């Protein structure tokens, strides 16, 4: 489950370094799809 696009504050502020925020509603979790070269929960590494 790749989730859905994040909305509101999460859409713009959750992921770092150009990552794409995704929301998994069934888990209430947010995660990021990171651009190449970045890793970490919020693409911070």
Swiss-Prot record:
Pfam families xref list: EGF (PF00008)
SUPFAM superfamilies: EGF/Laminin
Sequence ranges assigned to domain EGF-like in this UniProt record: 2-44
Disulphide connectivity of cysteines: 6-21, 15-32, 34-43
InterPro entries recorded: EGF-like_dom
Similarity comment: Belongs to the EGF domain peptide family.
Function in brief: Has both toxic and EGF activity.
Name listed for the protein in its UniProt record: Toxin Bcs III 15.09
Species: Bunodosoma caissarum
